[in-house]
Amino acid sequence: MTLSLEQLSSRMRRGEDIPLRETAQVVLALSIPSILQQMVVTAMEYIDAAMVGHIGAEATAAIGIVSSSTWLLHGILVGLYTAFSIQIAQYLGADRQADARGVLRQAMLFNLILGLAAAGFGIGISRFLPGWLGADLSLQANASAYFAIWSAALPFTMAMGMYAAMLRATGDALTPGLISVLVCGLDVVFNFFLINPTRTLPLFGTRVTVWGAGLGVPGAALGTALSNVIGGLLALAILLLRDGPLCIRKPGSWKITRACLLNLWRVGAPLAAERAALSSAQVVLVRIVSGLGTVAIAANSLGVSAEGLCYMAGYGIQDAAIALIGQAVGANRKDMAKRFAWLCTGIGIGIMALSGMRLWVFAPALMGIFTADAAVIALGARVLRIEAFAEPMFGASIVASGAMQGAGDSTACFVLNLVSMWGIRLTLASFFAPRFGLAGVWGSMCCELCIRGLLFLFRLARGKWLEKGALA
């Protein structure tokens, strides 16, 4: 029988030597649901891209031009709320359940305040953003509408991600996965009716008229927004009704504490800065790609979606690594934290190496899912095959950074990502894009990801990441 994370944490606090087999079972028990959740999230991106892609390359390009900006805004929020889940994991590892519940209450207030502020900011800049990014005039109206609608749902999108991370910190990776499955299913349904106009479809040998709003690109944004609203409300309801260490109904203060703010600053600020550095680099990269034409913009956007099939496993294992290592550090078991870190990283490298092989083989078929445009398929398949070589080291950087974050070493993650993205990827891309087009951009990306993976492995091997801690 597989140990629960709560049982494992109790044994770690007692100083027991836990066999490698049991350790591996816990890693897999947390990783598999998280990987499945990432698969569902990626599937939702595929659905949006495929449904819009069949409208035409311009519709795909309209979403692609603002996609990096959605990553930037959402990424900053993710970086900040991840700091709350790291604190909760470490408090639970130290058996300080009341403190963990206090962090949860403060996180709820944070979600309300910052989520609304981010939504207002996104809506406010949506009119001007495509122009700032160099989009063609024919793309700007749809791109602006997509970003505004997506931004409006940010408080709920943030709630869904934040509360899912907190559930994983307690060892429950299944519930967030089930919420994601529901959200993906709703996204399919909403997109089906909102993107396309009213039309006649075959059904059991006859033809039926199916209503559609015919909104196109804004319909895709509205479908995603509505499904995220439902997912966020559901995640909140589960936390409010749940018993266990994070039972919010138990007596406790809603006051924002100095200790929580200090922990948020020490861990969350570097994480948010890291996400901002990565995502803003993607914005610059989109700016570089936007000068290569509509086909390149569409191929780049769809290629990023297709590549998600590979790295979703890495991010699923990263989620598990944050929870496991956070609890090990909280229990003052650095030996177990090291074991979890290398075990998770090794699994991540192996799975993403296999995913890279699949990406190489099925690149044209993957692009064909999203669009019928032959030029976009050909260019997208070419750059995906370039990127396939980087997947193992990309996996190393993703999972190793999760291990370091779980221990509170978020500043090093920020520095390594900043140097890698801005010092290597953008420098190479700006040089090679005019000479080799989109292939030059993705070749630069491949080179940078390999170097980034090696940097994170070196940091992990040195062991200094265990000296930080996340609790004030």
Language-model features: locations:
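Short alpha-helical transmembrane segments in multi-pass integral membrane proteins
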Residues: M1-S34, I88-P155, L186, P202-A269, ...
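N-terminal transmembrane alpha-helices
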Residues: I18-A50, H54-I55, S68-Q87, L112-A119, ...
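Alpha-helical transmembrane segments of multipass membrane proteins
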Residues: Y46-A50, F128, M162-M166, V188-F193, ...
